């Protein structure tokens, strides 16, 4: 599985997920500098927190 890794809405960078991390995720939240995005490979989908504006977990290549 490969997942996007850059902190932008449009992302060309991907990484191959290590063994045991078979979920791509994308988390968005607002800061004083504007919207922040975090993307990576994870073993379990993180919980949605009240500070997040969106949370996406998926299992197909570059779906985040």
UniProtKB/Swiss-Prot annotation:
GO biological process: modulation of receptor activity in another organism
Paired cysteines (S-S): 3-24, 6-11, 17-41, 45-57, 58-63
GO molecular function (one): ion channel regulator activity
GO cellular component terms given for this protein: extracellular region
Key words, A-Z: Acetylcholine receptor inhibiting toxin, Disulfide bond, Ion channel impairing toxin, Neurotoxin, Postsynaptic neurotoxin, Secreted, Toxin
Expression tissues: Expressed by the venom gland.
Compartments reported by the entry: Secreted
Highest taxon, organism lineage: Eukaryota
Family: Belongs to the three-finger toxin family. Ancestral subfamily.
Function of the molecule: Produces peripheral paralysis by blocking neuromuscular transmission at the postsynaptic site. Very weak inhibitor of the endogenous nicotinic acetylcholine receptors (nAChR) in the human rhabdomyosarcoma TE 671 cell line. This neurotoxin is lethal to zebrafish by injection at the back of the dorsolateral region, but is not toxic to mice by intraperitoneal injection.
Protein known as: Long neurotoxin MS5
Species whose genome carries this gene: Micrurus surinamensis
